[in-house]
Amino acid sequence: MYVPQSSYLQLLENRIKIESVPFSDRGSRLLVYAHHGNTSSLYLKLAERLTAVVPGLSTYRNRPPFIQNLRLVDADGQPLAFEVTTYPHALVFQTVVGEFVLTFQDERTLSFGVPAISPCGISFSVLPDLARPDGNGGEFKSVRNCSYSTNGDTILNRVEDSGSGYNVALVVSGDADTAITLHIQAGLDLNRTVKPFRATLQAAEERWHTWFQTVPSVVEPYRNQYYYAWWVLGNNILSPQGFFQRESVAPSKAHYVGAWQWDNYFHSLAFRYNNPTLAADQIRFMLDHQQPDGMIPDAVYDEGTITNLEIPVAAAVTKPPIIAWSAMHVYEQTNDESLLREIYEPVVRWNSWWFGLNDDDSDGIVQYSHPFSSGLDDSPLWDSGVPVEAVDLNTYLCIQMEALARMARIIGRERETEMWRRKARALATRMIDHFYDPKAGLFWSQKDHEPIRVVTPFSLYPLWTGQMPHTINERLVAHLCDPQRFWATHPLPTVALDDPTYNPSQMWRGPVWININHIFVEALKRCGYDTIARDLAERTLQLVMGQNDIYEYYHPITGEAPPKAAPIFGWSASCFIDLAIRMSRNEI
């Protein structure tokens, strides 16, 4: 049986559960899955929205697979049952006729290595407009074009019209370098090259080994999930195509196709340790699409950008302003000023957009005009509608202006340094006057200048600024550490346990989000609550290590992933990586 030589790949043997998590590769939009309970069939989906074909920003989630009933077959073209062993770079299938191995020849091409013992191959169903078989495979033309090819001797090449598509079977004979490839792309010039399989498999192993080899080491308790987290990030990378002008990371190729603004910024936290260029590109990627008025889109996908939505209200939509904060974290690891020089002016325009176009009453407190701009899509904070003058948003802006002050100093714009510091201090003071309730010891967001009395960790966010009086910090930390509110079995729920709107399974109405915990670790550390910060970091790491996969959000009591939480979630993986490294280095 094939076993990779890389200890990293051996460590992750069978961690990838292809019934729910796609087997993919860095840059690729091809996603291979197995059916639950079916030991003889795979299917292939595309990490593309294809909105020109099926309108709607989320319709891709329900689109049928591009290739269905992908099977391993014997000499007669009959399906073979298999047992699969998964690795980051390959799927290894044991059958009665021998071992098949599936890997990526390149980001658009899957390569099957077939047993040399007897003729065998693959079969599949596809739904194209045109089929054209030939001597060593064939081509299909549709929304995405597909070819299947072999470098072996063709025994059977059967293409049957099913009425709604085609059923294909290709059986070949050959040796250890014989392969069958599936190539899928948008263009008409299909790549029919079939490389010797052993070289293809070795290249895939070396590619992933190098990916893992470049990352910092961590202490043993974190190691297994740590390398899985690095696989999650690598597996979620999408290559340049259409509006993607550089590599970017999808939040989850399984559920969120595209690049979301604040997800990208959190992803940069991990990449700064192993690939500073990729880290910086997560930031540059969003600025590639900055609007003339300074706004940065909510999300970008191959066919376009998301800058406005009609639901639940019609308004411009973006994401929280943490770009300068993330850029400074990248700089702290790399000491490379070039990124700061490059993005400073665009970030200034982004900051001006918030204050200039999102303060309807001109009181210096900025609002969300669309709930999705908060990133907290279904939070009870928006139950009464928008616009909302939000505690979290003004905290982000305070952090952003502080980061701009640091950037200005580093790139030699000293006069602007003090200006940004003054602006950050002034906003922190306005937040106390505007939002703080001394009786409750909480900051309340407001709609129509009436407090929204929903207890969430965002009522504690101003702690992060480091500019609150000690008496206020003490009140905020007391709430944070209250086991009846936020210090749950697994802190921190996104709605307090004792709030009437708390729902531990519904997205932003109760579950734990790893990025929010990451922010509070930083906030606590900044304000001198080192022991609590370390405790929260460790409990966050333990929460993520408690499940096989890495999820979008977690139940604060059971630690399990609620049913709708996306798997292989990027910012959860990135924040886990950052916390694991810093805890291993005793930096928290």
Question: Language-model features: where?
Answer:
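Terminal accessory carbohydrate-recognition/targeting modules of carbohydrate-active enzymes
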Residues: M1-P221, A254, W262, N274, ...
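N-terminal start-of-domain structural block
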Residues: M1-Y8, S149-H183, I296, Y301, ...
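Short N-terminal secondary-structure initiator segments
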Residues: G187-K195, L233-V257, V313-S352, G441-H449
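Extended, well-ordered alpha-helical scaffold segments
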Residues: P196-A203, R207, P221-Y228, N275-D288, ...
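Extended glycan-interaction surfaces of carbohydrate-active proteins
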Residues: V219-G258, M286-L287, P292-V313, D359-E389, ...
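Aromatic-rich carbohydrate-recognition surfaces in CAZymes
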Residues: V257-H370, V391-N394, C398, P511-A533, ...
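Structured, solvent-exposed acidic/aromatic patches
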Residues: P387-D392, E414
